[in-house]
């Protein structure tokens, strides 16, 4: 008889609490549905695990793990690893799960540690869902202030140093069982100790503040993942950040947002809606517009959410907001409606002289470049701005012009800049410009800088090469 890949062997009910049986059965069915829904492996990380299932883990293996590390695994996680799987499958490093998949049971336990998992897995977990940034920094900074000393295991010279670093890791990441990798320095882990035991937390090895998943246990978190694969929510051009935001339907979240006065809950609801797959249904956009008209403290964020799905519906609200908050409006247009940059060129030209915010100026120049083929004359005055960051952006923008060589006098002025960061941007902007009038100024720069301050010399070197010179030759 052929074994169905997605037909796990369910252990007798007496081996785990009966409350999990129905949910495990749903998960069993949804694994097959998820694989079918994502047959082209479009969900981020799915091409790595391919919805593979390892054989279920035996009770003896679970007990041996708990004894080795001195921990008690959450009941629902125990039920999962002992139930969900393909008894005839090969055991691989990962199996079906969020991002790059779930680690095979009992593996990668040191992912958040230098070593010493026998000590650290049973250590008290110091993390909490409501931890502030200040609390996180107070916990993590003192323990990793010398983290560069431990980047390479071969650099650890003494047993004392190893033990100290293990202790530091244990204080920050103690009580966490790594479940899988999200790529780069991000992981999801199962809390084993403390008041939040059983919860899933997203952690970052570069010490960004941890983010707890909203589900209160492993099975709910895993089933939510399968639901989002099946619904297509995770099949998206955008990075979906599963497990970081509330997963209920957008309609449910907006309804809760309307009927609660708790600010954190309101923020969580809108963040959840923001990360839904686009475009949102027209009825949801109607509700968002209604909320915008209430002019509450979330108005700007609601306009952003609307902008993601419908530029035409968002446009009147963007027009109302642009004079007061050009930075936000220019960002929204650039991020969500680049095809409509030309609509905003007159507004940008009108507001640009009064913009002092550096980020707002950056986004204004993006809209100009995209929406106006003759943006250069608008940008020229800002090469003399008192703010060096504004000057940098002005030269960078001018460097994107197809008519750069018509503005050689402006670039020559820039090559005499006192601010090295601005100067570097001017040099970069002259890529492939080989006019001999530039050479005397390039030589002056070569003599002026003995060291590669802000990569001046690194960028100057290929410019001099246009004229057959090296840095040393230019200094003569």
Language model regions located:
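A surface-exposed partner-binding patch
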Residues: 3-181, 296, 326, 339-346, ...
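Conserved hydrophobic register position within alpha-solenoid helical repeats
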Residues: 266-270, 299-302, 329-333, 360-364, ...
């Amino acid at each position: 008889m052929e074994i169905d890949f997605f037909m796990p062997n369910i252990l007798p009910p007496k081996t785990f609490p009966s409350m999990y049986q129905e949910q495990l059965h749903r998960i069993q069915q949804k694994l097959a549905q998820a694989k079918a829904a994502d047959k082209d492996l479009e969900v981020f990380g799915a091409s790595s695990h391919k919805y593979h299932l390892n054989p279920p883990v035996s009770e003896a293996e679970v007990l041996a793990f708990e004894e080795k590390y001195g921990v008690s695994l959450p009941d629902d996680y125990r039920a999962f690893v002992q139930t969900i799987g393909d008894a005839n499958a090969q055991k691989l490093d990962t199996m079906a799960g969020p991002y790059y998949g779930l680690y095979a049971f009992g593996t990668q336990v040191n992912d958040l540690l230098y070593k010493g998992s026998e000590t650290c897995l049973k250590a008290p977990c110091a993390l909490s869902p409501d931890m502030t940034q200040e609390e996180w920094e107070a916990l993590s900074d003192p323990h990793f202030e010398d983290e560069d000393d431990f980047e390479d295991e071969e650099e650890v010279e003494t047993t004392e140093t190893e033990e100290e670093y293990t202790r530091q890791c244990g204080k920050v990441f103690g009580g966490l069982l790594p479940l899988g990798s999200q790529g780069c320095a991000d992981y999801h882990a199962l809390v084993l100790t403390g008041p939040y035991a059983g919860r899933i937390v997203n952690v970052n090895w570069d010490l960004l503040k941890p983010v707890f998943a909203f589900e209160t246990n492993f099975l709910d978190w895993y089933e939510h993942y399968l639901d989002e694969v099946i619904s297509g929510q995770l099949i998206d051009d955008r990075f979906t950040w599963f497990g970081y935001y509330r997963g209920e339907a957008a309609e449910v979240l907006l309804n809760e947002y309307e009927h609660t006065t708790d600010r954190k809950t309101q923020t969580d609801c809108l963040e959840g809606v923001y990360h839904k797959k686009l475009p949102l249904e027209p009825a949801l956009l109607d509700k968002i517009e209604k909320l915008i008209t209430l002019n509450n403290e979330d108005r700007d964020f609601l306009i952003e959410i609307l902008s993601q799905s419908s530029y035409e519906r968002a446009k009147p609200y963007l027009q109302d907001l642009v004079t007061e908050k050009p930075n936000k409006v220019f960002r929204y247009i650039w991020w969500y409606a680049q095809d409509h940059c030309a609509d905003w060129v007159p507004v940008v030209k009108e507001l640009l002289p009064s913009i002092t915010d550096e980020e707002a100026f950056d986004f204004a120049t993006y809209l100009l470049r995209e929406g106006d083929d003759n943006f250069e004359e608008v940008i020229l005055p800002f090469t003399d701005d008192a703010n060096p960051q504004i000057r940098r952006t002005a030269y960078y923008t001018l460097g994107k012009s197809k008519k750069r060589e018509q503005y050689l006098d402006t670039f020559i002025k820039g090559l005499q800049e006192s601010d090295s960061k601005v100067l570097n941007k001017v040099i970069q902007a002259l890529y492939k410009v080989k006019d001999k009038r530039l050479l005397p100024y390039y030589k002056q720069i070569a003599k002026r800088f003995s060291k590669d301050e802000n990569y001046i010399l690194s960028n100057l070197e290929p410019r001099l090469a246009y004229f057959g010179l090296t840095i040393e030759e230019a200094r003569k």
